[in-house]
Amino acid sequence: MTRPVRTRFAPSPTGFIHLGNIRSALYPWAFARKMKGTFVLRIEDTDLERSTEASVDAILEGMAWLGLDYDEGPYYQMQRMDRYREVLAQMLEKDLVYPCYMSTEELDALRERQRAAGEKPRYDGTWRPEPGKVLPEPPAGVTPVLRFRNPLTGSVVWDDAVKGRVEISNEELDDLVIARPDGTPTYNFCVVVDDLDMGITHVIRGDDHVNNTPRQINILRALGGEVPVYAHLPTVLNEQGEKMSKRHGAMSVMGYRDAGYLPEAVLNYLARLGWSHGDAEIFSREQFVEWFDLEHLGKSPAQYDHNKLNWLNNHYIKEADDARLAELAKPFFAALGIDADAIARGPDLVGVMGLMKDRASTVKEIAENSTMFYRAPAPDAQALAQHVTDAVRPALAEFAAALKTAEWTKEAIAAALKAVLGAHKLKMPQLAMPVRLLVAGTTHTPSIDAVLLLFGRDVVVSRLAAALA
C-alpha cells in the first residue's frame, strides 16, 4: 500500500474504558508512529441514550496518561450528521440504497418463520427493487428505513493481518439498514463514511467487529473507496478466563493510576498483551514503537495476569526518579491521613522513596510501607514485651549514647551498632529488632542503619531515651 499510513481509535463513549479497550488505541498509535503516519481519534457517539461526556473525558484522560497522543481529532460523529445525510442522498440518487417499509413486527415474524424452517434469520429483500419485480404498495403514514443494496452474488474477501484470509459469501449478508426512519444513520454506515473521509489505511480493532467488516467493505466499495488493511485483535480475558469487562471486575484505565501504577509500566504490560518481540518483556515506549509490527500480533486471546503487571511495575518503580515518586506518593499519604505538614516535619520524602521503593509493587504500597516515618511510633505491646527485655536494655542505652556523638552517616551508625553487639555479645536481631520497634514502631523495615539515617539523630536518640527512661 503506497498511501501514507493513517490509523484510528474510534471508541464509543458509553461508560467504562478498561485495558482491553485502550489496547485498541495503543496498537494503531504505535503503528502510526512506527510508519511516520497519522493517528486519528474519533468518538463514535451516535448512541445518544448511552453516550456521556464523562465517558469521553475518561477516554481522553486514559490516553493522555499513557501518552497516546493523537494527530487529528477528536472527531465526533454527532457533529458529522450533515455529511452522512449528504452521502445518503448521493447513494439514493445512484440507486445504491432503497426505502424499506417492513415494520419491526413484520421483520420479527419473518425471522420466526425462518427459524422454524431451519433457515438463517435475515431480511428477505421484500422492498428491494429489481427489474420486473412489483413492489408492495407503501403503507400510509409509515416512514421507511433505508437499506443498502448488498451484492447478491460473489464474496467479500480480505487478508486480515491477524486472522489471515477471510471470505464471506454475499449470500450470507442481507441488505443492511443504514438510515433509520427519522433519518439518522446507523453505526456501520457512519464508520464507512468516516474511514473514507479520513483516509484510514489500517483498521486495527477488536475482533468483536469482524462480523461488521464484510458489510463495511461492501458499502465502502459502493462509494468508490479503497479498502483498508484490517487487523482484528483477539479479545483480552481476565484472570478467570472470561472476557474482560466491568461486569467481570475489570479495573478502569485510570483506576491503575489511582492504585499506584506507573503509566510506563501499564503501557509496557499492555503492549505485550497481544503482541510480542521475541522474548522481550521489558522495553521502553521508544523501543516498542521501533519494534511494533502487525505480523507479530497474537492470534489467540490474551489473558490478563495481575502478578506480572505488579512485577513490571516494581521494575519501573525501582528505575524511577525518587523525586517523581515522592510527588506521586503524596495523594496516597493524604489518603492515609498524613498531610503535607506531617511530611514536612518528617524525614526527607525523596530519601524515603529511595529507601522504600525496591520492595513495593505500587506507589500506593510505598506510601503504606512508609507511614512509620511520619507518625509517632505505636508498637504492639506483645512485640515490646518480646523484644525490649531487661537483658537488652543496657545495650539499647549504650547504643543511644553512642549515637549522640557518632557521625551521622549510614556507615557510622552501622559501626556503632556493631560495637555494641560485640560488647554485649548479642546477635543483630537482638538489638536491631527493639531499636526498630522503639524508633519506627514496627519490626518490618529495611536495613536498620538506613532507616535510622533517615529518621535523623534527634528523633532516634529522643525516642530511644524516652523508651528507656
From Swiss-Prot:
The keyword ATP-binding applies. ATP binds at K246. The keyword Cytoplasm applies. A motif ('HIGH' region) lies at residues 11-21. One of its GO terms (cellular component) is cytosol. GO terms for molecular function: ATP binding; glutamate-tRNA ligase activity; tRNA binding; zinc ion binding. It is found in: Cytoplasm. Its EC number is 6.1.1.17. It comes from the Bacteria. It is an enzyme of class 6 (ligase). A motif ('KMSKS' region) lies at residues 243-247. Residues 118-139 are annotated as: Disordered. One of its GO terms (biological process) is glutamyl-tRNA aminoacylation. Keywords: Aminoacyl-tRNA synthetase, ATP-binding, Cytoplasm, Ligase, Nucleotide-binding, Protein biosynthesis. Residues 118-131 have a biased composition (Basic and acidic residues). It catalyses: tRNA(Glu) + L-glutamate + ATP = L-glutamyl-tRNA(Glu) + AMP + diphosphate. Belongs to the class-I aminoacyl-tRNA synthetase family. Glutamate--tRNA ligase type 1 subfamily. Catalyzes the attachment of glutamate to tRNA(Glu) in a two-step reaction: glutamate is first activated by ATP to form Glu-AMP and then transferred to the acceptor end of tRNA(Glu). Monomer. This is Glutamate--tRNA ligase.
